[in-house]
Every structure is written in structure tokens, then in C-alpha cells.
Swiss-Prot record:
<comment type="subunit">
    <text>Homodimer.</text>
</comment>
<dbReference type="InterPro" id="IPR015424">
    <property type="entry name" value="PyrdxlP-dep_Trfase"/>
</dbReference>
<dbReference type="InterPro" id="IPR015421">
    <property type="entry name" value="PyrdxlP-dep_Trfase_major"/>
</dbReference>
<dbReference type="GO" id="GO:0006782">
    <property type="term" value="P:protoporphyrinogen IX biosynthetic process"/>
</dbReference>
<keyword id="KW-0963">Cytoplasm</keyword>
<comment type="similarity">
    <text>Belongs to the class-III pyridoxal-phosphate-dependent aminotransferase family. HemL subfamily.</text>
</comment>
<dbReference type="InterPro" id="IPR005814">
    <property type="entry name" value="Aminotrans_3"/>
</dbReference>
<keyword id="KW-0663">Pyridoxal phosphate</keyword>
<comment type="pathway">
    <text>Porphyrin-containing compound metabolism; protoporphyrin-IX biosynthesis; 5-aminolevulinate from L-glutamyl-tRNA(Glu): step 2/2.</text>
</comment>
<dbReference type="GO" id="GO:0030170">
    <property type="term" value="F:pyridoxal phosphate binding"/>
</dbReference>
<feature type="modified residue" description="N6-(pyridoxal phosphate)lysine">
    <location>
        <position position="269"/>
    </location>
</feature>
<dbReference type="GO" id="GO:0005737">
    <property type="term" value="C:cytoplasm"/>
</dbReference>
<protein>
    <recommendedName>
        <fullName>Glutamate-1-semialdehyde 2,1-aminomutase</fullName>
        <ecNumber>5.4.3.8</ecNumber>
    </recommendedName>
</protein>
<dbReference type="Pfam" id="PF00202">
    <property type="entry name" value="Aminotran_3"/>
</dbReference>
<dbReference type="GO" id="GO:0008483">
    <property type="term" value="F:transaminase activity"/>
</dbReference>
<keyword id="KW-0413">Isomerase</keyword>
<dbReference type="GO" id="GO:0042286">
    <property type="term" value="F:glutamate-1-semialdehyde 2,1-aminomutase activity"/>
</dbReference>
Length: 432
């Protein structure tokens, strides 16, 4: 049954007059699935409600931060109390230190942490710090790994084993792109070749320990360990971008889950409890290079603001409770098994990847281990799948190359309804 979204259609038309593309982040426009975006009015627990009154079980969770679900009472209460004291001061607060202590205690590789306002700020600052610490300029990233929209990270790979960066976006100067080298995720041999040729000029390797922006792609056994070994051998730093995976896949992030310690870690999403936030941290001798302790400059008007710190502390306090990650694993495993069975019953041979409470259904029968294999997915079939799910009250990311996020708020009834709707959506995709 077609979804009634008349008010959302009208709202999108109005938004496009004053906002580029009608949205403040491109994927929200539903362009890749050929639909009009739904405009959300409110959220409650595992559900979101659009301005036309439609209710959806939400697996976007504001793109990952809402691991507790919408309007968790402890987060809401903490924010209400904080608002009574003010919104921002541009001065040190006890909340900043409390948040920093929680983070460094959770991440064994981190002695100090600096708060910023977004994941992009965190990765941008981490790269500047790595260059300042090593005195080198080149950065290695992996194709399909997204680290925010800083110039040096908006780079894709060309052909050949060792390719200097080519800008993905207009507006990125070639001389900036030339300092970014692109490797292939899960391909240690290529990375070894890159270091053999460029190792003395490489300041850092930056990676998502679980790639979450080409679907969900876990590291092959030995891959992260191999990257760690190569960076140490050549005197480069290892930056783990845990903006998505930090406190999502494990308390202490993917680096604790896989037991590989980076030099610098970037965080965001969950540590703000749904408010704008970012952070980067690492070993003391590296972090003491950051101003005002050292010469590497970074600043921010709203960095460490009380509201984000309050929401983040409340969220992390709940996550620290006994059994929380076991609950998330149980829910996520149940959903994954149900989706696999629904796809089989619908006659589709698909590939599923999951790490903790983030998972992805790839519309390909090929094992997905990197950007190239992720791109074998049938995006037209995914678009049919997405549309059918939306019509049946299930809200997932409007892109084949994004994760589904399970939250503590998802009930067994939510998961069962999702599996039932997915069977219908898989059938529709199979017939497309």
C-alpha cells in the first residue's frame, strides 16, 4: 500500500528553495532510492513519526548515536537539569573532565582526549596532529572508508597498485589530494607495497576498524594487526576512526574487540547521546602536541559544551551497566538470523555482514570484503527493498552502503515485525 506522505512532499519542496538539495546532509534526500524523503517530527523509544503521522521502527538512530533509542528517560532527565544551568559558557566545566575520564578509562590506548563538535572535526584534527608529531605529510586511507568531509579525506583511488589521490569532490585542490594515498580495505599486500615505496613520507594510516560507510565490512583476521605492524615498522601513526564503532560494537570500541591498539582514536556519535560531538585522543606524548600544551593548533567555540557532555555521560553511564552489550548482541543476532531466513524464503541469495549491533544486507551473492565487492550490490533491488520496508513501517538508511543500527529500545516485537516486513520487501525485490 503506497505511503501517504503529502505533507513531507510539500515540506521537501519548500526546503529545496532555501537549503541546497533540501537537506543538510546529502544521503537524507533519498536520492539513491528515487523517493521523496519523509520529514520526521518526533521519536520515542524504537520508533520515529513523520509529519504525516506515519510511524516507523527506526534502524537509523540518527545515523548511529541513539544506541539507547529515542528520548531515553535518563538522557532526557540529565539534559533537562543541565538546561536549567545554561547552554554553553566557552569556559572549562567539570562535565568535560568527567567525559574525558570515562573515555580514557574505556580505551586502553588513550591517555588524553580532546573534545570537538563533529566526527569530521575529530578526523581532521587527528590528521593535523599526526603530521605535526611525525613531521611528515602523506596520509594513507582506504577506498570506501569515509572519515568526514575534510579536504584531504575526500579522496578516491584510481587504477594501479599505488595511486596518489584524485579528488572525489570539486573544490579539493590537487596538491592536497596528492598527499593522500588510497589503499584497499583488507588488502595487506597492497599496503605493504605502498609503504615500501612511500613509507618514509607517510605520517599516518587512517581507517575504520569496521568499515561502516560501504555497508558493514569487518576486517579479515590479521588485517588490523598487519596494519599496526607496518605503521610501527615505518614510524607512521595508526589512526582508528571509531566515530561509528566507538561504544557501538564494544565498550572501548572495535580496537578492544579486535585487540589492536592505535596511536590516535577519533570518536563521535554515541559519546554525544544524540547531540553534536566529536573527540580525538591517544598516547600522552602525542596529545601533548595539541595547543595550548603544544604547537599543533586546534580550537572550537562549542567544543565540550555542557549539553553534549551531559547527554554523552548519561548515555555512557547506561552502556556501562552490566549486560547491556550482551542484550545488544542478542537482539542483533536474532534480527540477522531472521533477515537471512526471510531472504532465503523469498528466493534471494544475498550477503550479510554484522559486527555487534551494526549490520548490512548486501544485494549481492558475492562475499563483501572491500569497496569493490560492496559495489557488486544491485542498488535497484535495494531501492525496491527500501521502498517496501518504508511502506510497511520500517525505517532503514536510504542507501545500500550504510549500516542498520540496533538499539536497546528495540523489542522482540519490533524485530519480529521487521523480519516479517523484510520478507515482503525481499519478495518485491526478487520480482523486480
Amino acid at each position: 500500500m503506497p505511503l501517504k506522505i503529502d505533507r513531507s512532499i510539500e515540506a521537501f519542496s519548500e526546503a529545496k528553495k532555501v537549503i541546497p538539495g533540501g537537506v543538510n546532509s546529502p544521503v537524507r534526500a533519498f536520492k539513491s532510492v528515487g523517493l521523496n524523503p519523509v520529514f520526521i517530527e518526533r521519536g520515542e523509544g524504537s520508533k520515529i513519526y513523520d509529519i504525516d503521522g506515519n510511524c516507523y521502527i527506526d534502524y537509523v538512530g540518527s545515523w548511529g548515536p541513539l544506541i539507547l533509542g529515542h528520548r531515553h528517560p535518563k538522557v532526557e532527565e540529565a539534559l533537562a537539569n543541565c538546561l536549567k544551568k545554561g547552554t554553553s559558557f566557552g569556559a572549562p566545566t567539570l562535565l568535560e573532565t568527567e567525559m574525558a575520564e570515562i573515555i580514557v578509562n574505556a580505551f586502553p590506548a588513550m591517555d588524553m582526549v580532546r573534545m570537538v563538535n563533529s566526527g569530521t572535526e575529530a578526523t581532521m584534527s587527528a590528521i593535523r596532529l599526526a603530521r605535526g608529531f611525525t613531521g611528515r605529510n602523506k596520509i594513507v586511507k582506504f577506498e570506501g572508508c569515509y572519515h568526514g568531509h575534510a579536504d584531504s579525506l575526500l579522496i578516491k583511488a584510481g587504477s594501479g597498485a599505488l595511486t596518489l589521490g584524485v579528488p572525489t569532490s570539486p573544490g579539493v585542490p590537487a596538491n592536497i589530494a596528492n598527499n593522500t594515498i588510497t589503499a584497499q580495505f583488507n588488502d595487506l599486500a597492497l599496503l605493504e607495497e605502498i609503504f615500501a615505496q612511500e613509507g618514509n613520507d607517510i605520517a599516518a594510516v587512517i581507517l575504520e576498524p569496521v568499515a561502516g560507510n560501504m555497508g558493514v565490512v569487518p576486517p579479515k583476521p590479521g588485517f588490523l594487526e598487519g596494519v599496526r605492524e607496518l605503521t610501527r615498522k615505518y614510524g607512521a601513526l595508526l589512526i582508528m576512526d571509531e566515530v561509528m564503532t566507538g561504544f557501538r560494537v564494544h565498550w572501548g570500541g572495535a580496537q578492544v574487540l579486535y585487540n589492536v591498539e592505535p596511536d590516535i582514536t577519533t570518536l563521535g556519535k554515541i559519546i554525544g547521546g544524540g547531540l553534536p560531538v566529536g573527540a580525538y585522543g591517544g598516547r600522552r606524548e602525542i596529545m601533548e602536541m595539541v595547543a595550548p600544551a603544544g604547537p599543533v593548533y586546534q580550537a572550537g567555540t562549542l567544543s565540550g559544551n555542557p549539553l553534549a557532555m551531559t547527554a554523552g555521560i548519561a548515555t555512557l553511564t547506561v552502556l556501562k551497566e552490566e549486560g547491556v552489550y550482551e542484550q545488544l548482541e542478542e537482539k542483533s543476532s536474532y534480527l540477522e538470523s531472521g533477515l537471512k531466513e526471510a531472504a532465503r524464503a523469498a528466493g534471494l541469495k544475498l550477503w550479510f555482514n554484522r559486527v555487534g549491533s551494526m549490520l548490512c544486507t548486501f544485494f549481492t551473492s558475492e562475499e563483501v570484503v572491500d569497496y569493490k565487492t560492496a559495489c557488486t550490490s544491485d542498488t535497484q533491488k535495494f531501492a525496491v527493498f527500501f521502498k517496501t520496508l518504508l511502506e510497511n513501517g520500517i525505517y532503514i538508511a536510504p542507501s545500500q552502503f550504510e549500516a542498520m543500527f540496533v538499539s536497546l529500545a528495540h523489542s522482540k516485537d519490533d524485530l519480529d515485525k521487521t523480519i516479517e516486513a523484510s520478507y515482503k520487501a525481499f519478495k518485491a525485490a526478487a520480482e523486480n
